[in-house]
């Protein structure tokens, strides 16, 4: 998380640095220019808005400098300074006051005035829009004597623009007025030659014939015979624009007043990861603003990127200004996760798997799988669209000895023309995910957490040479057919814990003088599994771990031996069963292991199914009764993906007892199925995406979920899924 924040900070610093460098370049470019040079430069096409703004401001500053240089000696040395002051135009007087050449006689008066004239209501199309009662003009008090050149914009019922100004008969014949459709236009940037003489030979009103476009800012200005801006009146744009669309569907853009939009105005869709778009040229699709009735369904498919819609106004000369910009669409989390795949006949032939949301990936998106973290997009790796939700690295022996490998999702930013890192994930993120989110989870009941679980958790050592165990006596098939369906995990219990798995299904039988984990065949020793758990819990004392011992093929002496081994190795980390199924995460601090000991399903013990149903008299209180967990499943019925999914869906809305609950997303083998030439790994890979869709539906509809148990648990993005659900549910509850 700290790395992501560091990346964002660096990006913001880079943007600010680029902005400062651009500003310096513009200043250097125009530092020695005259007013004439600058005005000429304004007429050159394809200038960016920041450059236009700088030039306009520079012209204004140079004009002010000339005025100050002209009048300062006259007013400071002349005996006729009062006469000179009276002859100075209001605009020049304002500049001299600003530069402390003249005193401001109206300094106690508010610097702006507000029109209360009836023209503050705009009438067009038979409708009236009342502007705010305090609609300001840009007139200054010092510019507003009794005969002020107060200019206004009027919109007629047929949606045409008139310009009105006061007391024309008192003004110079060479004064003039003009109409502009954006605020920062140079003096000669008026609309379609709509400038008019405004002096003593006019009526103070002109009908421009220009259609009012509510999507543009409209401005009228009054200039004196020296081309000095005296007053102006602005009607702000009423333009807005919106972009939306479901993931995988065409993006839809809406905007108002399309019928009066300029025929050369453009609606554009942008993909920008670094703030509002700045240039029409970087858009990914366009349409004309006066088309599509203001409702445009683009051919661009929503791939979950930060899309913007922008209304670009044509200001002539091939130049455009941004009239309105939508809020960005929130980028869709690709649900990037890291897993580990087993390939081949031994568990040391391993690939790193990068899982991600397979819906609507952009053609340019790609995934990198690396043994170290990357800070910049590298050589494009696996195409995200083609890979359809999962990429597997090439086999790499280094993956067996480390969790420090990364998946990196890269997308393209059209605004900058570069790839950027959209999301990163590392297997180490799951190592202590409960501890990392402890403040959010400590008050949650364990039965209300969503937890990854592994089915027949310690079967990673099963191979074609493994001896058959007592639970396989009813199968009368060769070992080479049965072993591929008996191995359900490829990672050790310690590595599963590091991958974020928190529920373990453990079955036990004796072989010679040792107790082993079994599933049709003998796998790793119980002692080694307990040592794996001890190693992990010693490093992570707040990570909730649920051990479910069941299907115990043990005589009474072995049953007691197993309980003794568990207590001796893990005892100090085991919580007391009197805490019950309502136990909260915080209640397990320091003793995070819930050890459920189900010795009823035991055909060899007097206390099990083969005996009198009575348990041993002595039972440690740290061994939880199996009544604290529910794990519904019918092994005789679910032998295909369709039947399993139907069962799982049927259980979603069944009221659940207030105990731990297991969702068994697993297959039970039945030889009526065509198993020859198949194995459980192949079946899991074939149906993995369908199970993921089911899990995603549980998330979408916030269906109550506790433990999700699967075969080959690292083949699924379950840990990141559970982290997301637990933290999101916490955020929603707050």
UniProtKB/Swiss-Prot annotation:
Residues 440-604 form the PI-PLC X-box domain. InterPro entries: PI-PLC_domain, PLC-like_Pdiesterase_TIM-brl, PLCXD1/2/3, PLipase_C_PInositol-sp_X_dom. Keywords: Coiled coil. It comes from the Eukaryota. Pfam families: PI-PLC-X. Gene3D superfamilies: Phosphatidylinositol (PI) phosphodiesterase. Transmembrane segments: none annotated. GO terms for molecular function: phosphoric diester hydrolase activity. CDD domains: PI-PLCXD1c (cd08616). Residues 8-70 form a coiled coil. One of its GO terms (biological process) is lipid metabolic process. PANTHER family: PTHR13593, SI:DKEY-266F7.9 (PTHR13593:SF113). This is PI-PLC X-box domain-containing protein DDB_G0293730. It comes from Dictyostelium discoideum.
């Amino acid at each position: 998380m700290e790395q992501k924040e560091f990346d964002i900070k660096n990006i913001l610093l880079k943007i600010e640095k680029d902005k400062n460098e651009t500003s310096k370049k513009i200043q250097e470019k125009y530092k020695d220019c005259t007013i004439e040079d600058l005005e000429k430069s304004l007429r050159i096409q394809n200038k960016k808005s920041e450059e236009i703004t700088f030039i306009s401001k520079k012209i204004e500053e140079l004009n002010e400098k000339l005025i100050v240089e002209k009048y300062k000696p006259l007013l400071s040395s002349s005996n006729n300074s009062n006469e000179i002051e009276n002859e100075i135009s209001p605009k020049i007087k304002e500049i001299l006051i600003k530069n402390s050449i003249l005193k401001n006689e109206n300094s106690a008066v508010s610097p702006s005035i507000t029109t209360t004239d009836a023209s503050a209501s705009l009438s067009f199309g038979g409708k009236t829009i009342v502007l705010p009662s305090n609609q300001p003009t840009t007139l200054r008090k010092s510019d507003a004597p009794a005969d002020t050149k107060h200019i206004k914009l009027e919109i007629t019922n047929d949606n045409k623009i008139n310009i009105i100004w006061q007391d024309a008969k008192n003004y110079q014949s060479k004064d003039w007025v003009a109409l502009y459709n954006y605020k920062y236009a140079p003096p000669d940037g008026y609309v379609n030659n709509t400038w008019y003489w405004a002096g003593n030979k006019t009526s103070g009103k002109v009908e421009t014939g220009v259609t009012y476009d509510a999507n543009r800012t409209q401005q009228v200005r009054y200039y004196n015979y020296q081309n000095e801006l005296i007053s102006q009146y602005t009607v702000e744009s009423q333009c807005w624009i919106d972009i939306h669309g479901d993931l995988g569907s065409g993006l839809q853009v809406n905007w108002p007043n399309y019928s009066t939009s300029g025929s050369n105005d453009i609606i554009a869709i942008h993909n920008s990861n670094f703030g509002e778009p700045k240039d029409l040229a970087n858009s990914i699709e366009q349409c004309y603003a006066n088309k599509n009735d203001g409702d445009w369904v683009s051919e661009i498919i929503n791939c979950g990127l930060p899309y913007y819609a922008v209304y670009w106004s044509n200001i002539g000369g091939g130049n455009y200004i941004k009239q309105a910009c939508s809020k960005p669409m929130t980028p869709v989390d690709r649900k990037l996760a890291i897993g580990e795949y087993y390939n081949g006949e031994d568990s040391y032939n391993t690939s790193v798997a990068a899982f991600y949301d397979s819906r609507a990936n952009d053609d340019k998106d790609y995934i990198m799988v690396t043994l170290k973290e990357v800070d910049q997009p590298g050589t494009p790796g696996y195409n995200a669209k083609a890979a359809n939700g999962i990429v597997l690295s090439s086999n790499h022996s280094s993956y067996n000895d480390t969790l420090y490998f990364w998946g990196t999702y890269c997308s393209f930013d059209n605004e900058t023309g570069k790839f950027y890192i959209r999301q990163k994930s590392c297997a180490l993120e799951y190592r202590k995910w409960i501890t990392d989110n402890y403040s959010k989870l400590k008050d949650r009941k364990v039965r209300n957490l969503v937890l990854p679980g592994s089915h027949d958790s310690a079967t990673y050592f099963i191979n074609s040479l493994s001896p058959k165990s007592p639970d396989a006596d009813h199968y009368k098939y060769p070992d080479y057919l049965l072993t591929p369906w008996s191995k359900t995990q490829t990672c050790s219990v310690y590595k599963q814990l590091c991958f974020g798995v928190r529920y373990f299904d453990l079955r036990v039988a004796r072989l010679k003088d040792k107790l082993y984990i079994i599933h049709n065949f003998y796998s790793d020793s119980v002692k080694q599994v307990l040592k794996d758990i001890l190693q992990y819990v010693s490093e992570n004392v707040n990570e909730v771990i649920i051990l479910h011992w069941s299907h115990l093929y043990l005589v009474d002496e072995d049953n007691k031996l197993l309980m003794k081994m568990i207590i001796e190795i893990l005892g100090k980390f085991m919580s007391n069963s009197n805490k019950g199924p309502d136990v909260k995460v915080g209640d397990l601090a320091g003793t995070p292991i819930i050890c459920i000991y189900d010795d009823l399903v035991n055909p060899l013990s007097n206390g099990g199914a083969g005996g009198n149903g009575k348990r041993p008299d002595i039972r440690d209180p740290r061994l939880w009764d199996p009544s604290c967990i529910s794990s519904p499943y019918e092994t005789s019925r679910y032998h295909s993906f369709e039947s399993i999914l139907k069962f799982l869906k049927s259980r979603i809305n069944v009221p659940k007892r207030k105990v731990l609950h297991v969702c068994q997303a697993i297959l039970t083998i039945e030889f009526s199925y065509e198993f020859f030439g198949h194995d459980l790994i192949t079946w899991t890979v074939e149906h993995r995406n369908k199970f993921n869709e089911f899990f995603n539906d549980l998330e979408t509809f916030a269906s109550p979920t506790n433990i999700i148990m699967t075969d080959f648990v690292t083949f699924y993005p379950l840990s990141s899924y559970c982290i997301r659900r637990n933290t999101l549910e916490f955020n929603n509850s707050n």
